[in-house]
């Protein structure tokens, strides 16, 4: 059976890039590579709400046999 693997097609589909291209993309002088402040603020607020809500629950271990955990 003949191997008909096309490396160029694979690179396009897999988004394979060279180290030099990554260095160029991640250069510290790149403008617009990060999130906006509004987006970052929203993510922090949502994360804070989720952490706050889940930390207020009374969690019981799954194997707990105490009355307070069963009811």
From Swiss-Prot:
Keyword Ribonucleoprotein: no
Posttranslational mods: Contains LL-lanthionine and DL-beta-methyllanthionine, when coepressed in E.coli with the flavecin synthetase FlvM2.
A single cellular component GO annotation: extracellular region
Cross-link for Lanthionine (Ser-Cys), residue positions: 35-39
GO molecular function, one term: signaling receptor binding
Subcellular location: Secreted
Gene Ontology process terms (BP): defense response to bacterium; killing of cells of another organism
Modification 2,3-didehydroalanine (Ser) occurs at: 36
Maturation propeptide residues: 1-33
Numbered residues of crosslink Beta-methyllanthionine (Thr-Cys): 54-60, 62-65, 66-69
Domain of life of the native organism: Bacteria
Alphabetic keyword roster: Antibiotic, Antimicrobial, Bacteriocin, Lantibiotic, Secreted, Thioether bond
Role summary: Lanthionine-containing peptide antibiotic (lantibiotic) that is probably active on Gram-positive bacteria, since its analog [Del1]Flvbeta.c shows antibacterial activity against M.luteus. This activity is not synergistically enhanced by [Del2]Flvalpha.a, an analog of Flvalpha.a, which is encoded by the same operon than Flvbeta.c. The bactericidal activity of lantibiotics is based on depolarization of energized bacterial cytoplasmic membranes, initiated by the formation of aqueous transmembrane pores.
Annotated protein name in UniProt: Lantibiotic Flvbeta.c
